């Protein structure tokens, strides 16, 4: 089975080699969310320009970006002397009036391509991805910095189709050595408005509907329980006050009756008459 880097390189080939190459979107294995609203990740041209014969000298690869349109579909990136264009993002209105140079990187010899088997190593994952991929639209500050030096790779426009081209430049002569075809149109993602989001419950799972229903009705039941607890506490307090008042009334009515009627009745009936009769009897004896 051929190494994975060979598979990636062959994925960028179209109809042969040399000028018949096209830049391709990065594999979903390495860039799951691609393109985004403002960025596009591409596979670097590994083993493309030097696949048939080794190159001698120092070379760089320039990446050009162009907004897709009928008038600029086959736009040139070099002048009549084969000198590569140095147009910037600002000069071309973000690629709308012509291609601009978004990035430049050294050409990695085919024999020095890093092994993708090491991508499982977390410490080397970023290094390997940078060796195989290039992302367009990652610099969000270069347009705002008046002192910025170098290539400006600002965010792309959302919902816009772009084309991309790799150009091989011989750094000794400063001339174009080779180049790919323009890529097929690649469209950046579109911002989804909140009003366009489908919230119909029919597209939700049964579990989501049950959980949503429970959470929605839970505050209602809590409110009912709280109100019931308040009513019960008020009823219990009223019963306790009524019982205390009833006991105090019974006590107040019972005490005067026992002190005011029993004792005087007992004294007047049992003791009063017997004392009067004894006094009368004693006076008669003295006479």
UniProtKB/Swiss-Prot annotation:
Function text: Component of the asymmetric unit membrane (AUM); a highly specialized biomembrane elaborated by terminally differentiated urothelial cells. May play an important role in AUM-cytoskeleton interaction in terminally differentiated urothelial cells. It also contributes to the formation of urothelial glycocalyx which may play an important role in preventing bacterial adherence.
**GO BP terms in the entry:** cell morphogenesis; epithelial cell differentiation; kidney development; potassium ion homeostasis; sodium ion homeostasis; urea transport; urinary bladder development; water transport
- The record lists glycosylation at 74, 139, 170
Task: Give the bilayer topology.
Answer: Single-pass type I membrane protein
Positions of the UniProt region annotated as Disordered: 243-274
The molecular function terms in GO held by this entry are: structural molecule activity
Which parts of the chain does the record assign to the membrane side Cytoplasmic?
236-287
Gene Ontology cellular component list: apical plasma membrane urothelial plaque; endoplasmic reticulum; endoplasmic reticulum membrane; membrane; plasma membrane; protein-containing complex
Residue ranges spanning the membrane: these are 208-235
Keywords of the record, alphabetical order, are:
Endoplasmic reticulum, Glycoprotein, Membrane, Signal, Transmembrane, Transmembrane helix
Which cell locations does it reside in?
A: Endoplasmic reticulum membrane
Q: How does it assemble?
A: Heterodimer with uroplakin-1B (UPK1B).
Q: Which cysteines share a disulfide bond? A: none
Q: Which gene encodes it?
A: UPK3A
Q: Provide the protein name.
A: Uroplakin-3a
Which residues belong to the signal peptide in this entry?
1-18
Tissue specificity, per the record, is: Bladder epithelium.
């Amino acid at each position: 089975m051929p190494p994975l880097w060979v598979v990636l390189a062959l994925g960028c080939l179209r109809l042969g080699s040399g000028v018949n190459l096209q830049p391709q979107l990065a594999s979903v294995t390495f860039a799951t969310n691609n393109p985004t609203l403002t960025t596009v990740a591409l596979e670097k041209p590994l083993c493309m320009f030097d696949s048939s014969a080794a190159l001698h000298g120092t070379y760089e690869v320039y990446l050009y970006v162009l907004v897709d349109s009928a008038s600029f579909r086959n736009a040139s990136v070099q002048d009549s002397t084969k000198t590569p264009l140095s147009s910037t993002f600002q000069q071309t209105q973000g690629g709308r009036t012509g291609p601009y140079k978004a990035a430049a990187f050294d050409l990695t010899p085919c024999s020095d391509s890093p092994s993708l088997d090491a991508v499982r190593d977390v410490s080397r994952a970023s290094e390997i991805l940078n060796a195989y991929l290039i992302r367009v639209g990652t610099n969000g500050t270069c347009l705002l910095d008046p002192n910025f030096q170098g290539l400006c790779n600002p965010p792309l426009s959302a919902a816009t189709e772009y084309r991309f081209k790799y150009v091989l430049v011989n750094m000794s002569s400063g001339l174009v050595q080779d180049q790919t075809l323009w890529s097929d149109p690649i469209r950046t993602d579109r911002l989804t408005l909140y009003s366009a989001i489908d919230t119909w419950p029919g597209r939700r799972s049964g579990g989501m509907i049950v959980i949503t229903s429970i959470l929605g009705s839970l505050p209602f039941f809590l409110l009912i329980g709280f109100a019931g607890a308040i009513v019960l506490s008020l009823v219990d307090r009223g019963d306790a006050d009524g019982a205390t008042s009833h006991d105090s009334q019974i006590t107040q009515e019972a005490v005067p009756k026992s002190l005011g009627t029993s004792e005087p009745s007992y004294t007047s009936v049992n003791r009063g008459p017997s004392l009067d009769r004894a006094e009368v009897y004693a006076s008669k004896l003295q006479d």
